[in-house]
Amino acid sequence: MSKQEKYAGASALQGLSLGQQSAYISQYSPALLQPVPRSLNRDDLGLTGELPFQGCDVWTLYELSWLNARGKPMVAVGEVSVPAVSANLIESKSFKLYLNSFNQTRCDSLEAVQAMLVKDLSACAGSEVSVTLFPLAQAPHHIAALPGECIDEQDIEVDCYEFDANLLQGAAGNDEVEETLHSHLLKSNCLVTSQPDWGSVVIHYRGPRLDREKLLRYLISFRQHNEFHEQCIERIFTDLKLLCHPSQLTVYARYTRRGGLDINPFRSDWELPPTNLRLIRQ
């Protein structure tokens, strides 16, 4: 059974603006924000008690504009961090529509807009969300490279594009290492619309050495898989812990932007999130 079929009757997905024609409201409307319970996929992963990781979902906002007190348009770039312990993730299309609602709204200052975002996003997520807005001249603009070794250049024949955690069976070697690996070949699909989500993923771990071919095949198997960005990264973390037994693990993905937003989920049992620096595809 596909993830779409599995979640087809989920009440949490009913009424989402995602996949529907939407009116673009240009006056401030926090009611546009829509939460999705994280339990929707965490129950499936057995994550019903204390979480085995900490982390956050870091969003970058590229299309944010409002009017100042005199009616002149203002623009900024934003960084939002939603804690992984929050009850809900924030549905991305509703986030975009919410940001658009600032377009014809008069606000006294950048700080006032930032405070509105903190209040509304925290209410949607069910936990305190941090927001930083940058005037364009102060916005981070460096294009970064992922840390560690890329596993994408392996010359392998691939024929499995349906998600299969069993591709990690036997991926844990005998020698203990600490290493960082990354791949740019992560691709999954939106749970509701099946639109492609393109990402790059970093895996930093201590424990039995990972078989890089098996790891790459596993990551490629997400190619026809339907789940939200955040859910995919928690699935990768959980599968690696269960099947490869690292003593310490970080899984961090950076997805390409859609609708002026990019989502960058970070999950770890031993590290804090890195600086939010975009990749070449972002």
From Swiss-Prot:
InterPro entries: GTP-CH-I_C/QueF (IPR043133), NADPH_dep_7-cyano-7-deazaG_red (IPR050084), QueF (IPR029500), QueF_N (IPR029139), QueF_type2 (IPR016428). SUPFAM superfamilies: Tetrahydrobiopterin biosynthesis enzymes-like (SSF55620). It is found in: Cytoplasm. One of its GO terms (cellular component) is cytoplasm. It catalyses: 7-aminomethyl-7-carbaguanine + 2 NADP(+) = 7-cyano-7-deazaguanine + 2 NADPH + 3 H(+). One of its GO terms (biological process) is tRNA modification. Disulfide bonds: none annotated. Keywords: Cytoplasm, NADP, Oxidoreductase, Queuosine biosynthesis. Homodimer. This is NADPH-dependent 7-cyano-7-deazaguanine reductase. It comes from Aeromonas salmonicida (strain A449). The gene is queF.
